[in-house]
């Protein structure tokens, strides 16, 4: 997925979950929890990224309670107060301002979001690349 141990990876959970035709629409919170568990395992691998931020929106926010989620080690879960895309842009902008040299990768297939975060210096990959890393 990302080869740099200093990297920040920001995941558009709604977009990634929506890319799998596995019935996610029947239980958005459950689908988000499954993705969080998979990402947690990936984040804890020795060659995983330094930091993984997962942005949840809408009904998927019920996948977590509060800020502390010990079952999802290695992840920072952000529950978007409004638009998930806006929350992702805020995370990327803050990270770029804090350390302009840190590699930032956003996982999404949303063309509008890709344009917004690339303008801030982030690299983007599609959900399939992330899911291939999870499934391997």
Model-found features: residue ranges?
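Nuclease catalytic cores that cleave nucleic-acid phosphodiester bonds
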Residues: 2-11, 17-136
């Amino acid at each position: 997925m990302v080869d740099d141990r200093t990297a920040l990876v920001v995941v558009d959970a709604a977009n990634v979950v929506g890319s799998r035709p596995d019935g996610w629409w029947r239980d958005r919170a459950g689908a988000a929890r499954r993705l969080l568990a998979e990402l947690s395992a990936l984040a804890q691998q020795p060659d995983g990224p330094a930091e993984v931020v997962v942005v949840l929106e809408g009904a998927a926010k019920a996948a977590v309670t509060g800020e502390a989620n010990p079952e999802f080690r290695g992840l920072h879960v952000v529950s978007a107060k409004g638009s998930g895309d806006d929350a992702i842009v805020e995370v990327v902008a803050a990270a770029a301002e804090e350390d302009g040299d840190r590699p930032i990768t956003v996982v999404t297939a949303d063309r509008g979001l890709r344009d917004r975060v690339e303008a801030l210096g982030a690299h983007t990959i599609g959900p399939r690349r992330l899911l291939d890393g999870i499934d391997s």
